[in-house]
């Protein structure tokens, strides 16, 4: 009788543990985020009449829960209507679309222009998540990076522009929210218009037209030092095997050989969020793009980043 009681007790404990484990798994939510510079709102004169519609089609095919759009330029209402999502038009340039309710909007116009930065808080089935969209200045042009120079000269060239100043302003205004990131996770993506130190390594110095250079690009260093993780590089840690090109997708239309690299990112931070998948889609402007088994005309000069996260 005692053996039977002990067995029943052990069985009950096992069932409770199994139920707790199952409940924990079921309580985790996934959130898929897409970041894309759609090139003049999808209505560039280069491909007049094609870009908008196919941009919407690709976004729908992605099944992203959140879309960070750069170079929105008039497309926001049509994108939101096409997806059936809530949206926040931060500026003519930046917009965010969400399958989940937007419960707060963020702008820091006194410190950083809304043309460069802004965000929202969304409610993912009771779990708040802060999401920010970013655009840093395109000059100095990454295509012209003097990779035949010393590391110091390359960094001096980069500092001639405003990207370093912009990212530090952004990180400064985010400080109070970063302090809460372990309870309310933060996702920050967009078009940073600059390379990453995680891509310009000793292993890649003689690849991808890097010209032998190993460069600690300041913007990605600043993001890392602020506690952000690069979702794509975390999921694809070998830049030799997968550089993750997002620019220039129209490189083969240029008269001279041009460096193609990763300048679009999705970063994240917080104890209750973890990247579980990420891909960069480096596609050629104006060419056929096969995505999830379907062919599309590709409308942008940027590829896009698609990252999937798990929320505790």
Enumerate the predicted regions with their spans.
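Bacterial Sec-dependent N-terminal signal peptides
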Residues: 1-28
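N-terminal, active-site-proximal structural segment of metallo-dependent hydrolase catalytic domains
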Residues: 18-82, 128, 301, 310-312
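Acidic/histidine-rich helix-loop elements
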Residues: 35-53, 137-162
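Active-site metal-binding loops of divalent metal-dependent hydrolases
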Residues: 36-38, 136, 191-192, 303
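Active-site environment of divalent metal-dependent phosphoester hydrolases
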Residues: 40-43, 73-78, 115, 139-142, ...
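Structured beta-strand-rich core segments of catalytic domains in phosphoester-bond hydrolases
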Residues: 66-145
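His/acidic metal-ligating clusters that form di-metal
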Residues: 159-192
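Metal-dependent phosphoester-hydrolase catalytic domains
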Residues: 176-186, 194-312
């Amino acid at each position: 009788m005692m053996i039977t009681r002990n067995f029943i007790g052990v069985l009950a404990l096992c069932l409770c543990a199994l139920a707790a484990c199952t409940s924990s798994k079921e309580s985790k939510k996934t959130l898929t985020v897409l970041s894309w510079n759609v090139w003049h709102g999808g209505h560039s004169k280069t491909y007049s009449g094609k870009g908008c519609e196919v941009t919407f089609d690709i976004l729908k095919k992605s099944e992203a829960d959140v879309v960070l759009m750069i170079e929105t330029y008039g497309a926001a209402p049509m994108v939101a209507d096409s997806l059936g999502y809530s949206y926040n038009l931060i500026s003519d340039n930046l917009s965010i679309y969400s399958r989940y309710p937007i419960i707060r909007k963020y702008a820091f116009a006194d410190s950083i222009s809304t043309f460069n930065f802004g965000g929202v808080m969304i409610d993912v089935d009771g779990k708040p998540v802060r999401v920010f969209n970013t655009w840093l200045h395109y000059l100095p042009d990454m295509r012209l990076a003097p990779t035949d120079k010393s590391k110091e000269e390359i960094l001096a060239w980069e500092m001639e522009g405003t990207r370093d100043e912009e990212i530090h302003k952004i990180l400064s205004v985010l400080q109070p929210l970063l302090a809460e990131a372990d309870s309310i996770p933060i996702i920050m993506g967009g078009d940073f218009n600059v390379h990453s130190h995680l891509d310009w390594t000793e292993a890649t110095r003689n690849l991808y037209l890097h010209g032998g250079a190993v460069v600690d690009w300041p913007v990605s260093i600043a993001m890392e030092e602020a506690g952000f993780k690069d979702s794509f590089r975390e999921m694809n840690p070998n830049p030799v095997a997968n550089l993750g090109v997002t620019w220039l997708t129209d490189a083969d239309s240029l008269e001279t050989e041009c460096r193609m690299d990763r300048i679009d990112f999705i970063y994240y931070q917080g104890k209750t969020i973890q990247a579980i998948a990420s891909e960069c889609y480096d596609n050629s402007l104006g060419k056929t793009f096969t995505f999830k088994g379907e062919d599309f005309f590709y409308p942008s000069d940027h590829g896009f980043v698609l990252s999937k996260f798990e929320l505790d």
